[in-house]
Amino acid sequence: MTQPLPGARAVSAENELDIRGLFRTLWAGKFWIIGIGLLFALIALAYTFFARQEWSATAITDRPTVNMLGGYYSQQQFLRNLDIKTDPASSDKPSVMDEAYKEFIMQLASWDTRRDFWLQTDYYKQRMVGNSKADAAMLDELINNIQFTPGDFTRAINDNVKLIAETAPDANNLLRQYVAFASQRAASHLNDELKGAWAARTVQMKAQVKRQEEVAKAIYSRRVNSIEQALKIAEQHNISRSATDVPADELPDSELFLLGRPMLQARLENLQAVGPAFDLDYFQNRAMLNTLNVGPTLDPRFQTYRYLRTPEEPVKRDSPRRAFLMIMWGIVGALIGAGVALTRRRTI
């Protein structure tokens, strides 16, 4: 059995970590560790007083109710009923509330909506420095401070929007203003679509009514002409009374003269007095056209959403997180203090 050489034993002893010695050294330098740790924690504390603060407010939204849409709902539903009459398949469309909320969500998440919102706020104007590049960079940052998260129906999560500002009241007030701003833009777009659809339906209904009138007038003219021709034949043949047992309504036009001159004259006068005959569908279309000619009554401020979580002033600051920074930098300071203590021990 071989024995380790004395030199090898000495090298092994030098490479072993002296745990007791390490802790004695750290204990001896505890004032350095605690002092530098406290110093870094105090520096972190001071930083939190001067660093820019970030507070965030959150809102959760869902589709509006019928009452919130006001007159827009009834007018849009009126147009839909016209469409269903001509095309029954159009009844499968999403509800008016769903379409209004879809437009609201589109505006809420839109980059242009966020940009236009910040440009008209005092919050942005008060922070402008007059430098185009700096102001553009700040505007871009503010745009990114409005964060929209779409809902997920599979996980029962609703749409939500978060706004970050420098103070808690600003975060709350600006988020409320932004949601209202997006809703107003959505209402404006929906009103424009309503006006366009209303005008298109008016043109269509006018064309349909005119077509029905032309058809009725053509039938009337043909009927008058048939009776006039039959009356001439009856006068030529001196037929003064009915010469057929067939009911008048069942006689073809070529045999109407058999009714006799008096009856034909009476039928002609009655037809001329009554004028063209229109069916019920024509009068319904005329009533619809009269309503369409009045035009839509637009409400520029109807609400296209409802809150499931109304924005409130946040109670906790997002950044800087004072306790976290003090603990983190206190630990960093303690590690640096431990390094200083070990270095001083070796030099001694």
Swiss-Prot record:
Its main location: membrane. It is a multi-pass membrane protein. The chain crosses the membrane at residues 31-51, 323-343. Keywords: Cell inner membrane, Cell membrane, Membrane, Transmembrane, Transmembrane helix. It comes from the Bacteria. One of its GO terms (biological process) is enterobacterial common antigen biosynthetic process. Pfam families: Wzz. One of its GO terms (cellular component) is plasma membrane. InterPro entries: Bact_polysacc_biosynth/exp, LPS_length_determ_N_term, WzzE. Belongs to the WzzB/Cld/Rol family. PANTHER family: ECA POLYSACCHARIDE CHAIN LENGTH MODULATION PROTEIN, TYROSINE-PROTEIN KINASE. Probably part of a complex composed of WzxE, WzyE and WzzE. This is ECA polysaccharide chain length modulation protein. It comes from Salmonella typhimurium (strain LT2 / SGSC1412 / ATCC 700720). The lineage of its organism: Bacteria, Pseudomonadati, Pseudomonadota, Gammaproteobacteria, Enterobacterales.
